Amino acid sequence: MQKLELLYEGKAKRIYRTESADMVWVEYKDSATAFNGEKKETITGKGRLNNEITTLLFRKLQEVGIKTHFVEKLSETEQLVKKVSIIPLEVVTRNVIAGSLSKRLGMEEGTVLAEPIVEFYFKDDDLGDPLVTEDHIRVLNVASPEQVSVLRDMALQINQVLIDHFASCRVRLVDFKLEFGVTEEGEIILADEISPDTCRLWDETSNEKFDKDVFRRDLGNLTDAYEEILKRLGGISHV
């Protein structure tokens, strides 16, 4: 498979065309951003870590029958994925009160929820990716009610798999963001990435943070935190 011209560059990844009409080449960048791009930094090794961790987690999900766009890891920072039409919704699943939910509900960070909460955010940088209801989604016409139901069900299914998987590594899955895409055949599959960039991951005993909050809140060395997650997942750490 050959990498051809650049199709799209986002905050964390570059997407390239390949000679296959149904595959694209993804390159993970070393850039870190927070607060809708207001805080930016280049962090050497971050792209490699997110690629490694996403590869491990997508393979785990595929093992239990969850369909994803992941095809194969090509290098330390690159992977081949199926081409999909991204649904412009971020699907956030929360197991523990943290971040914006703590501020919105006035509840203490770290409060464990009796059951997961699934939220939808409209992907629009100019609007700041606002939280939207299912009624809003219908007005925006970005997904059908049937598709929203599938997104919710898949998010909850993925949540349970990841909760169990991270628990086996002594990590608490606090919350995480997913993105989904539609194949040419009309099937909804998991896309984008699952990494400490898109999850809140805390040590199950100390609540030490191993995710992008380390960068957001200036809590320490970001790559050290991501390396710890990779090591606990059984990947090859470069520390």
Curated annotation (Swiss-Prot):
Q: Please indicate if the UniProt record lists Nucleotide-binding as a keyword.
A: yes
**Which pathway does the record list?**
Purine metabolism; IMP biosynthesis via de novo pathway; 5-amino-1-(5-phospho-D-ribosyl)imidazole-4-carboxamide from 5-amino-1-(5-phospho-D-ribosyl)imidazole-4-carboxylate: step 1/2
Q: Which reaction does it catalyse?
A: 5-amino-1-(5-phospho-D-ribosyl)imidazole-4-carboxylate + L-aspartate + ATP = (2S)-2-[5-amino-1-(5-phospho-beta-D-ribosyl)imidazole-4-carboxamido]succinate + ADP + phosphate + 2 H(+)
Q: Which InterPro entries match?
A: SAICAR_synt/ADE2_N, SAICAR_synt_PurC, SAICAR_synth, SAICAR_synthetase, SAICAR_synthetase_CS
Q: Which NCBIfam families match?
A: purC (TIGR00081)
Q: Which family does it belong to?
A: Belongs to the SAICAR synthetase family.
This chain belongs to the protein called Phosphoribosylaminoimidazole-succinocarboxamide synthase
